[in-house]
Design a protein with these regions (language model features):
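Charged, alpha-helix-forming regions
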Residues: 39, 100-119, 123-126, 130, ...
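Extended intrinsically disordered, low-complexity coil regions enriched in Ser, Thr, Gly, Ala
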Residues: 223-246, 276-277, 281-282, 286
């Protein structure tokens, strides 16, 4: 039944109940019932979620009000399936070992530290099929990401050009599960996903990331093209395409998809260990396709309530 039909039905019920005598008190009560009806209606283009559920996903992700939360009881050995978590632990352990790590004049990590981190190969960074040669911190987005998240989360501090652990950082090294929870919350809620790219929109993909998690929870166990999720996201939030312009033979929708896939999968969920991807075809021949599905960590770490 359409929302307008429901409103008409409620109105008729009130008229019948009060024999046509509608007081301000009754009108206020009726208005509240109408708003509740609107906010709890199912939206077909948003996988049947209601406006109320979408609002909670957008503004209260991972809280008790959201339909998506993190599993606080995740075992340490399961948490350690996350590549970014392992890189973060290694980073914090190096700082702990050095006690006070002296940075370069530009406040970057020393080259030997960057090489030590990158040599662990927790995360593969490449441009298409070409490996990136890492010399400095600026050559590795994943290392920069771990450093930024660690600072935002209060795990490290810098004083007089020297980097050291906080008491919080030292404590979290003993609990990979708690570290993963804090890292994930900071990545989704405080770190700006646009930090490492030049896309025009600053909020696309991150604002609404909770909805992507719902989509993956529903469809992710079976491999699908990455564009499937971008298009599903666009169906629920069509206005986001307005933030992109046509150019280089791309429509605004195509430009959005490229931004969404890069931020959500390539520099987010893949590195967190929540999804895995597979490529087929050839880019130069125009036959390239990328496929994605969720990992066991995704299902062990995320909880979906009333979805």
């Amino acid at each position: 039944m359409q929302t307008s039909d429901n409103i008409q039905r409620l109105l008729q019920q009130k008229i019948d109940q009060y024999k046509g005598v509608i007081t301000p008190e009754i009108l206020n009560r009726f208005s509240g019932e109408v708003m509740k009806e609107i906010n709890q209606r199912s939206l077909p283009l948003a996988e049947g979620l209601s406006p109320e559920q979408l609002h909670q996903l957008l503004h209260f992700l991972f809280t008790e009000r959201s339909i998506v939360s993190l599993n606080a009881s995740i075992p340490d050995d399961v948490a350690l399936k996350s590549p970014l978590l392992n890189l973060c632990i290694c980073y914090l352990q190096i700082i702990q070992r050095e006690e006070e790590m002296k940075l370069t004049k530009t406040e970057a990590l020393p080259m030997k530290i960057v090489n030590e981190l990158y040599s662990k190969e927790y995360i593969s960074e490449k441009i298409w099929t070409l490996p990136i040669k890492v010399r400095t911190e600026q050559d590795s987005i994943s290392i920069q990401l771990v450093r930024v998240i660690s600072k935002l989360a209060g795990m490290t501090k810098m004083l007089h050009g020297k980097l050291s652990l906080t008491a919080k950082g030292t404590s979290l090294l003993k609990s990979p599960s708690k570290l993963l929870i804090l890292f994930t919350e900071t990545f989704f809620l405080r770190f700006a996903w646009s930090y490492f790219d030049i896309f025009k929109s600053r909020q696309v993909a991150q604002f609404g990331a909770g909805y992507t998690l719902v989509l993956l929870g529903k469809y992710g166990q079976h491999e699908k093209e990455v564009n499937f999720y971008a298009k599903k996201f666009l169906e629920a939030f069509p206005m986001v395409a307005d933030e992109f312009e046509s150019g280089f033979s791309r429509s605004p929708e195509d430009a959005f998809c490229h931004c969404y896939i890069t931020r959500t999968f390539h520099r987010g969920l893949m590195w967190l260990g929540m999804v895995e991807t597979r490529e087929t075809g050839n880019r130069m021949e125009g036959t390239h396709q990328e496929w994605v599905k969720t990992t066991s960590l995704f299902h062990d770490f995320l909880k979906f309530n009333n979805v």
